[in-house]
Regions:
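Terminal, non-catalytic protein-protein interaction segments that mediate quaternary/complex assembly
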Residues: 1-173
Length: 173
């Protein structure tokens, strides 16, 4: 059964470095998600390194070799350039820039793709803000990261694997 929500669902991670959520319903290997996060940051899409840890990973590949919707590959290669490099550079150039968007959805290919692995998460927005303006006593600059999702499994995807992956991306940026 799929639980459907009429309105958008929003989750806030106040402690993103606490990457792993341990839920009795979800028996997972937290080290695998860490390895997968590094694999993403490297811009890979080959399934073999992940299949060494979780054999079922090949079931999500159309050809047994590559994951079509690999976020890391899309961050680093999909659109002909390294988006992560540009995100970091834009923040260095102007930390208050509100146009920093990391795309994972490729409308030219994904909208009509019939395969197994279409990205659930579509975009990520980055926004820096001064904490003093939010009532905090110290005046630090924090980086907010908002992940937009078209569809996701809350326990297995969002609160499981994606919490680890995106917290690593947040720290990398």
């Amino acid at each position: 059964d799929v639980l459907m929500f009429r309105d958008p669902v929003c989750s806030t991670y106040n402690f993103p470095r606490e990457r792993v959520m341990f839920l009795p319903e979800r028996n997972c290997n937290p080290f695998f998600h860490f390895i997968e996060g590094l694999w993403m940051l490297a811009g890979r899409r080959d399934v073999e390194p992940l299949a060494r840890f979780v054999k079922r990973m090949k079931e999500f590949s159309d050809d047994g070799n590559f994951l079509y919707g690999s976020y890391g590959y899309r961050w680093r290669n999909q659109f002909g350039y390294d988006q992560l490099h540009d995100v970091v550079q834009k923040l260095k150039d102007n930390k208050w820039d509100r146009r920093i968007v990391l795309s994972m959805w490729d409308p030219v290919h994904d909208l009509h793709y019939k395969g197994k692995d279409v990205p659930c998460n579509t975009q990520i927005y980055f926004k820096a803000y001064p904490t003093k303006e939010l009532g905090e006593e110290n005046n630090q600059i924090k980086l907010d990261m908002t992940v937009c999702c078209r569809s996701n499994d809350l326990i297995w995807g969002a609160y499981g694997a994606n919490a680890v992956h995106f917290s690593m991306l947040h720290e990398y940026i």
